[in-house]
Regions:
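Short, glycine/polar-rich helix-capping loops at beta-to-alpha or helix-loop-helix junctions
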Residues: 102, 180-188, 257-263
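C-terminal hydrophobic helical "lid"/dimerization subdomain
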Residues: 2-4, 282-335
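Glycine-rich beta-strand-centered segment in the early N-terminal region that forms part
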Residues: 31-48, 56-100
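NAD(P)H dinucleotide-binding glycine-rich loop of Rossmann-like/cofactor-binding domains
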Residues: 72-79, 89-155, 300
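Short amphipathic alpha-helix with an adjacent loop that forms part of the alpha/beta core around
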Residues: 204-214
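Glycine-rich phosphate-binding loop and adjacent beta-alpha segment
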Residues: 227-301, 334-335
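N-terminal Rossmann-like NAD(P) cofactor-binding module of classical short-chain dehydrogenase/reductase
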Residues: 95, 152, 198, 220-221
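Mid-domain Rossmann-like dinucleotide-binding core that forms the NAD(H)/NADP(H) cofactor-binding site
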Residues: 125-203
Length: 335
């Protein structure tokens, strides 16, 4: 019997600036058998996230960096094809840190089962996965929006931003999205129900904020950092809340990360700025998933997945995150 081959992308070097194909090495290994308490998963879909850029850095963070020569970390969903673990049986579908490869073999730490009969598998990487959990807890627990308030979201056409904006609408807020390009801004309003949009590629963000938020910004959900964060800080309302969810404009800097110049706006407006790491909310994922599932089933929230086929396309597909090409959740289908 011919041994099965596991294609893998390994971290070959730590990138300076944008990662490229040389950041990763490609390997093919034989698929092994699970030892005691291990499972073997055939990966079907992988989640491509801005956080992956941070995992490549040799720096202290909320989880250890990926080691040189290790399989590139990625969340994903797949099917258990062999198991020596009491909680997982052959045929189960699971969500976990599967890595950029055809098969995961190891202990299923943090893995949980998903049901493809209830929702398509890619949805468990978007609205029903870490993306949805991030949007849910960052907005509701940290941002604490109230009906009638103005919520501004950067990276609004991306995976987290598009869902966060829709949740804010459900809470009775006026929602303004910041995105790059007329097509994305149109999608925010026509498909996701945002009240307004600012095209940072083709207009001055400060002027757009003045137009769309005449009374100021009560909640700012920041996914990009940099100059856009600075622009929003100048428009904060009294007691505003700034949620730091990401800073994609800064992830590939070769120089030091740029800090906000207008931070004194927090002082004069009695506002607060708070960072958010989704894993802090892991004990509450079930409650959020239940509510998100209800919103999706009723059509109150729409989830958009940008699915690219082919494990071999991983290095190029990952770069779509940083060029702004993707619309919604970027997912890699393992062929």
């Amino acid at each position: 019997m011919t041994a099965q081959i596991n294609r893998q992308f390994l971290l070959a070097r730590r990138p300076q600036g944008l990662p490229d194909r040389e950041t990763f090495s490609y390997a093919e290994t034989a698929v092994g058998e699970p030892a005691e308490s291990e499972i073997l998963v055939r990966n079907e879909y992988l989640s491509l996230d801005p956080a992956m850029r941070g995992w490549m850095n040799d720096a202290k963070s909320y989880i250890p960096p990926v080691g040189i020569g290790e399989v590139m970390r990625a969340l994903g969903v797949g099917k258990v094809v062999a198991s020596r673990h009491a909680d997982f049986a052959v045929g189960d579908y699971v969500n976990g840190a599967l890595g950029v490869q055809d098969y995961f073999l190891g202990k299923p730490k943090g893995f949980y089962k998903v049901d493809p009969s209830r929702a398509p598998l890619p949805l468990y990487l978007s609205a029903l996965g870490m993306t949805g959990m991030t949007a849910y807890f960052a907005l509701l627990d940290v941002g604490q929006p109230k009906a009638g308030e103005t919520v501004v979201i950067s990276g609004a056409a991306g995976a987290v931003g598009s869902i966060a904006g829709q949740i804010a609408k459900l809470k009775g807020c006026r929602v303004v999205g910041i995105a790059g390009g007329a097509a994305k801004c149109k999608t925010l309003i026509d498909e996701f129900g945002f009240d307004g949009a600012i095209d940072y590629k083709n207009e001055d963000v400060s002027a757009g904020l003045k137009r769309e938020c005449p009374k100021g910004v009560d909640v700012y959900f920041d996914n990009v950092g940099g100059d856009i964060l600075d622009a929003v800080l100048t428009r904060l309302a009294h007691k505003a809340r700034v949620v730091l969810c990401g800073a994609i404009s800064q992830y590939n800097n070769k120089q030091a990360v740029k800090g906000p110049a207008n931070y004194l706006s927090l002082l004069v407006n009695s506002a607060r700025m708070e960072g958010m790491v989704v894993m802090s909310y892991a004990p509450r994922f079930a409650e959020a998933a239940q509510e998100m599932g209800g919103w999706l089933a009723s059509g109150k929230i729409k989830s958009k997945e940008d699915i690219v086929e082919g494990l071999q396309t991983f290095p190029e597909t990952l770069l779509k995150l940083f060029s702004g090409e993707n619309l919604g959740k970027l997912v890699l289908k393992v062929d």
